[in-house]
Amino acid sequence: MDPTPHYPALAWLLISSGLVFFMQAGFLAVESGMVRYKNSINVALKNVVDFCTSFAAFLVLGYSLMFSPSADPIGLIGMPVPFLSDLSLLNTAGTDVFTIFPFAFFLFQATFCNTAATIVSGGVAERCRFMAYVLVSIGIGLVIYPVFGHWAWGGGWLARLGYHDFAGSSVVHLLGAGITLAGVIVLGSRAGRFGPDGKPRTIPASSMPLVALGVMFLAFGWIGFNGGSAPLGAQTATIVINTLNAGAFGAIGVMMLVWALRGVPSADLILNGVLGGLVAITASANVVSIPASCVIGLLGGAAVVVGTRLLDRWRLDDAVGAIPVHGFAGVVGVVCTGLFADATWLAETKQMTRAHFTTVQIIGSIACIAWAFGSGWLLWKLVGKGTSLRIGPDEEAVGMNYSEHKVEEPLQQLTQAVVDSANGRRDAQVLDLVRDGELAPLARSIQALIRRQAEQRRESANWAVTLGEVRSMLTQEQHAGGTAARESRSELTDAREAIADVGKLLERRRLEDPTAAVLLDLVRMLERRLDAALAALPRIDRSLERVAAGTGRLDDLAAAMRGRA
């Protein structure tokens, strides 16, 4: 066959491959902007490396498992052909551009595999170790993506049922979301993402403008993602219009919902709404009308909002919203293909009723979720057996730019210095590391604050010692006063009893001896004085009790001072 007439279609396929590859830059920008600055380099590097690893794995074996004839009667997996070594087994029979130029088709499909892998990096960001993610991305390109791809696109059992996923709402996006969900569950949430009561806490993005730029890159790349999934022809323009239209209405759907629920246009949800609309239309861009693409886009955006709220309720920490965008919107896209597919196409091409076709679409989405989550969970667990999956608390606090890659940035140095100083592992002078950089004013302010806190701790320790000494002195005085009071009470009581006996004797002799009457008056006066002295002793006891209470308060104050020290 003379390939010359197909060169324009080949050119479009290669351009589309470049556009899909450019989406990698969009994902890099979205994910780097969504995470905190201290983890941005790690996330960016993962996006670069997962392209390398998944591309290599897809080349080595994955492509053949996906597109070669089924190795079993059911259609579960293709025949292994390492390194594209035998193209005669890779569905090269046909007349369209995909089969005439098999290497160009491989290139296009490899970029799709890259997309499925890179979806995962965002969802598990800020806690998954770099090496663990590299191994996971290899597993995706080698087995997980090719197997479901064979079911749906390689002549497998789903394709035989009549399943339709035009450009990958399930094959790429829902699959990536399922693997992400498994990773999120296995890894757990980031520190501080949920409070002690389970309520979600917002972890701010480092750069929403970068996220917005990434979304625009992705929308631009989606022109090739969907437009290149069919041979160049009259339908290409309609496919591209449906694609961008759904992205626009995805954002509109989110804005309407968010304004109704919050009264504030949330930046991250609106941007994810664009992506949700794009994901949803990807399954059906070639078989639905333009008005239907508007509805699908609206539903895709709404799915992002619903999915985000459900993840918060379930306490699942998806750092960038990958599961709502690619998972929830992916399901919407697959099911809506059955609901909105062109009736003529459905009757002539699929030869099914709408109910039958929609049932097949639902079966396909369930199969995708089950395969992606099940195989993904197993992959995460297997990788965890060989290497550590998650960074430690101190590494998470300082950030993965430094803990994983030792990137010495001023902010990273400052953060590390503050963490070490707070933990008592370094002197506050370590902040001088950044004294000459752009963060020098902030570093000096933090250094001064740490030094003031150190001085306050020393002063608190001194006050605790002083209060302890005062407390000891008061305790001694209290004991001495109590002893003296008891001795005085005993002596005064004895004296009072003796005087009372003398009074009784004088009372009997008063009539016989005039002098006794005078002495009796003196005795009565002395009795009154002794009674007054005895009556005053309880007031001394109460005073000593107040001293004891004051001593207790001094104990509390000294303990508080020791705590501040």
Task: Name what the model sees in each region.
Residues G399, D521, A549, D556-A565:
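Intrinsically disordered, low-complexity terminal
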Residues H479, R486, K504-R510, R542:
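Long, low-complexity or tandemly repetitive, helically biased scaffold regions used
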Residues L389, V407-S421, L431-A448, Q456, ...:
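HAMP signal relay modules and closely related sensory coiled-coil linkers
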Residues T4-A11, I15, L519, L526, ...:
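Heptad-repeat coiled-coil amphipathic alpha-helices that mediate oligomerization/assembly
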Residues Q447-I450, A454, D531, P538:
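Signal-transmission coiled-coil "S-helix"-like helices
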Residues M1-N423, A428-I450:
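Hydrophobic alpha-helical transmembrane bundles of multi-pass membrane proteins
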